[in-house]
Amino acid sequence: MLLFVSRRRAPVARPVRRAADASFPNRRRPAARKHSSMHIHILGICGTFMGGLAVLAREAGHTVTGCDAGVYPPMSTQLEAQGITLIEGYGAEQIDLKPDLFVIGNVVTRGNPLMEAILDRGLPYVSGPQWLGEHVLAGKWVLAVAGTHGKTTTSSMLAWLLEDAGLNPGFLIGGVPLNFGVSARLTDSSFFVIEADEYDTAFFDKRSKFVHYRPRTAVLNNLEFDHADIFPDLAAIETQFHHLVRTVPGVGRIVTNGRSDALERVLARGCWSEVERFGVDGGWQALPAEDGVPVDERFAVYSHAERVGEVAWQVQGDHNRMNALAAIAAARHVGVPPAQAAASLAAFRNVKRRMEVRGSVDGVTVYDDFAHHPTAIETTIAGLRARIGSRNARILAVLEPRSNTMKLGVMKAQLPASLADADLVFGYGAPTGRDALGWNLGEALAPLGDKARAFDDLHLLVKAVTEAARPGDHVLVMSNGGFGGVHQKLLDALGSRT
């Protein structure tokens, strides 16, 4: 029987078995499916997802080799430390390795020499997400975290909550949680936390990656338009999210952001699982713990108007409180009491490249952050402003808009508003190559007036930031790429000032 979920209301009861929180810590666990060892050769192995998959495959006992167009540290170093042989480029001669299976990353397209050889010879191949679903996730209790923003942070929180509760989860995350020091690991636990990406699976499978994961617990963190290179509009992404909803069993649970109209539209298309909302009255909420205590330092967790825990931590921002609520609600589904989960967040150390301090020189602190979508840029600046407190402390925002969506210019009009709370803005657009912008960054930043400047020369950008920075300033570098090592360049330049 199909259940349609109305806006901001709990699902109507149905004549099926209701999802229940797992007993904690003892309960019957599903047995993981076993697979015989094989040799897999991974195309596009140095990507975040495929590199993590390679580590999991190696830990599962498979022989793993791989290739990529850019074999360089830190991913190459991490993979080689796992005993994984890496090959530079996609030469067709790699079919002579004679693996049992080729695993294809979504960076690979038709025309790739090795892929063409695989197709011409009729050799077996599969996408990375499908291989993961069939060989790692099958038989496990999968906790998948989806959403436009906060996937990496929320996945890291959730993995930590299960770890601190003694559940020893496996995980695959699109960043490096500082509590673990690795982005992926395989354990004998029945629980597996995965960052569930909506980007497409492969050139031959245009569904979102997450349809392969079959979660029992699904977190829908938020939903905005993104990935303009593959999605024409928000409705197309909503369709993919509904595909994910369709894979959650009736005894599963969906934890969703009750503030998101887009996610409410997704659920209104049909939902067959129990739904819990966070961020709204009647669901999970983060409220002041007591009068006079900043909510960024300590907040109370409420579930259905009942106070169930308290979080004291060093992670700033309303967006991170929402991430925390999602993680606590998801952890409860596998049996972690909310009070225990809330207490565990005191030891959560966040994720590399999420407001990560790269160094401090001459009173100037340089941060690294992965923000590249206008919403993420705005919330990241707001989070740093909350951390440093005083308006006398300046934020110098250094931005490289290099995501596929940004390069297309779809969101350039939103940049000024997202950067408005920074004191100075330094934008960088590569003049040539794959990261070159197809639009004028200076014109896009013009509404910010004299406080914003655009550069197409990294050396000149570093020089300008160094000249502008003064003791007490905070330089916030935002990019979803390496940004030419600008963080260290800035620290070196600041250190050489006389």
Predicted regions and their residues:
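Short coil/loop residues immediately preceding or within conserved phosphate-binding loops
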Residues: 37, 140-142, 296
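Phosphate-binding loop of NTP-binding sites
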Residues: 56-60, 80, 94, 106, ...
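A short glycine-threonine-serine/GTX helix/turn-capping micro-motif
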Residues: 207-208, 310-318
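Intrinsic, low-complexity polybasic segments
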Residues: 7-17
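ATP-dependent carboxylate-amine ligase
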Residues: 24-75, 80-85, 98, 102, ...
